[in-house]
Structures are given as C-alpha cells and as structure tokens.
Amino acid sequence: MEIILKQDVQNLGFKDDVVSVKPGYGRNFLIPQGFATLATPSAKKVLAENLKQRAHKEAKIVADAKALAETLKALEIKLTAKAGGEKLFGSITNIDIAEALEKSGNAIDRKFITSGVVKRIGKYNATVRLHRDVIVELPYEIVAEK
C-alpha cells in the first residue's frame, strides 16, 4: 500500500514522502492518526505540484539548516549530573540535551535529537537531524556535580 506522509514519522520517512507500508499499518494507524493519506494518482499529482512550488523555499531552509549545523559543531556542551564515581544517579537523555541547547540559544525539538540513554560520566555524541539532508553529530560531555 502506498501512502503520502503528512508529517515526519520516525523510522518511516519525512513529510511529503511517498512510501510503501503494509496495508494494516497504513489503514489502522497512519491514516486514522492523520500521519498519512492514501497515495492515489490524483494525490500524487497534487503532491508533485506542491513540491515544485516549494522547491525554491526548500533551498533557503537547507541553507539555514547548514548554518545551524556549523554553529552546533562549534558548541561545547557540558551537562552536569549527580554521580557516584563514574556512574550517574539517573540518566542523560535527548530531553536533557535539548534543554542544554535551548540555554545556549539554539532551540531544537527533542524529537530531532537521537542519543542513547547515558548512565556514565564521559564524552558522547548525539545525532541532530536539522533537515532530511542535514544531519550533524553533536559532541557533549557529562561531568559530575560538585
């Protein structure tokens, strides 16, 4: 079954992508939740027309995302957490990284930050998806609270 995504769906695709999914997934989840519409020939034609009109806007969005990526690469993020030795009491997740980015003046939604759950002190990398074509590795360090 082919569908057109109305918004980004993790592990499936981005907004306005035409993707093939199993019929049950599309009919019972994606379409009722408003994440997708059925990819009929007329819907594909309308999508192609809309994408053509948005092509010039897309170039500006990609340029802005690349500029933000360069800013993020230059950032040094230090997160503090309570720890006993090398092990944290609790964990650091993408929510904590998003809050640290917001404090530095670069607000990015936590959904676009991918990092595992970190439970030890040290240096790590998070993946930030700014655009479908712009993905940046964000280094961060976790230090113990004093």
Swiss-Prot record:
Physiological role: Binds to the 23S rRNA.
Name the UniProt record assigns to this protein: Large ribosomal subunit protein bL9
Keyword Ribosomal protein (UniProt): yes
Gene Ontology molecular functions: rRNA binding; structural constituent of ribosome
Highest taxon listed in the record's lineage: Bacteria
Family of the protein in this entry: Belongs to the bacterial ribosomal protein bL9 family.
HAMAP family reported for this sequence: Ribosomal_bL9 (MF_00503)
One of the record's GO cellular component terms: ribonucleoprotein complex
Record flagged with keyword rRNA-binding: yes
Keywords assigned: Ribonucleoprotein, Ribosomal protein, RNA-binding, rRNA-binding
Classification of source organism: Bacteria, Pseudomonadati, Bacteroidota, Flavobacteriia, Flavobacteriales
GO biological process, alphabetically ordered: translation
NCBIfam families referenced in this protein's UniProt entry, alphabetically: L9
Pfam families: Ribosomal_L9_C (PF03948), Ribosomal_L9_N (PF01281)
